[in-house]
Structure formats: C-alpha cells, structure tokens
Regions:
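Predominantly soluble domains enriched in secretory-pathway, periplasmic, or organellar proteins
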Residues: 1-206
Length: 206
C-alpha cells in the first residue's frame, strides 16, 4: 500500500520490508497504522493487477499476483481493511452477473514470464462475506489471465497466458473447456457486454 505521504510511517515500513527481504519471507507483513489505532498497514512488496469495486460502491478489490490474493480497500478512506488469499498469481477479477460474487483468475505463477501447465485456478469469492466459496482447478494445469463473463452470466471466458489456450468455465459447475489458440493470449472480450461506453482493457463497459 502507498502511504508515502505520511513520514511517520516510513521508518516502520522500511524496517518491515528490510526484515522480509532478509528472511526471504513471502507472507503478508503488517505494521500498526500510526494514524488509525487498531488498524494495520500491509508492507509486503507486491504487484497489483486488476481492480474492481463492490456492487454498493463501498469497497475496492485489488488482485495482487505477488502475494497470491486480493487486497480489500475501503472506498472512502483508501485504507486496506483486509486480504483474501485466493491462489498463485492472482490476476484478473470479474463480478458475477447477479452481483453476489466475483471470480479471481489465479494465473499460476508469480513471474511475468510463466511456464505452461502451472497451478492456475479460478477462485469464487462472496461479496458479502469476502470469503472464497469455491476453487476451480484446471485439469492438467493452466494459466488463466484476463477475460469476461458472458452476458447471461453462464460462462467465464479467460485467456490462458502461458498455455496458448482460451478457457471457458461453467459458472454453475466450474467445469472448464479449452480452446487452443495462438501464442500467449493475454486477454479477450466476450461480446455483447452490458453497457454502452468502453472504459478500456478487456470488455470493461458501462
């Protein structure tokens, strides 16, 4: 998290990061928030990828491929309020059409250049409880990246970045179909999508 406008926290953050580097620990590390008694600041170096907002607009969810999960950030204060472990290389986030849950594409690698047949998966997270309710593994391994939910909500389509594949997940059962495509499909857009105006990237419309 970026709290660099607050000098009183810098020394503690720097110390925590240095200790994490010495120990080689990749786990989440927290220090007390000097501005908010009882709250903590995450100091673990990471690489945020995708960002989505809750249906009520109160909370941001940020996938982080270096810490294998999703940061939960309050939309009013911009402070982290939680963390949801999902899977290795958490990358893309896609809300379900009913607005009750969201899907997290775990790319199966913490590296920019991964390898085929990694431990890729999709985590289903409940918006209300902020807990993982299901995990859909990919038989034989895979690397789900970016994509879209179909307009009727029945399928989650994702590019398989390191496997030259596109995945289609059944959102009821988690069953996955694979389509071989060209090299390193990063993202894809399923059409049509609800909305009129494109906000960029893979099918973000409003």
């Amino acid at each position: 998290n970026a709290y660099f406008e607050r000098p009183q926290a810098l020394a503690a953050i720097a110390k925590a990061i240095a200790e994490a580097g010495k120990s080689g620990a990749a786990k989440m590390r927290y220090i007390p928030d000097p501005d908010s008694p009882g709250q903590q600041i995450c100091t673990t170096p990471g690489m945020p990828q995708d960002v989505r907002i809750s249906p009520d607009g109160s909370t941001f969810y940020i996938a982080d491929m270096m810490v294998d999960g999703v940061h939960v950030v309050d939309g009013e204060s911009f402070k982290q309020t939680g963390f949801i472990p999902t899977g290795k290389g958490a990358h893309g986030i896609y809300p379900s059409r009913d607005g009750k849950s969201f899907y997290v594409a775990n790319r199966g690698s913490n590296k920019i250049r991964g390898t085929p047949n990694g431990p890729g998966s999709v985590s289903v997270v409940d918006f209300a409880t902020q807990k993982v309710t299901k995990t859909w593994e990919i038989p034989g391994g895979g690397s789900p990246d970016m994509g879209n939910v179909s307009v009727n909500g029945k399928y989650l389509w994702l590019g398989g970045r390191y496997d030259d594949t596109v995945y289609r997940f059944d959102t009821d059962t988690g069953a996955v179909d694979k389509i071989k495509v060209g090299r390193e499909p990063h993202g894809l857009t399923v059409w049509p999508q609800p909305g009129r105006y494109s906000l960029g990237h893979t099918g973000n419309l409003r």
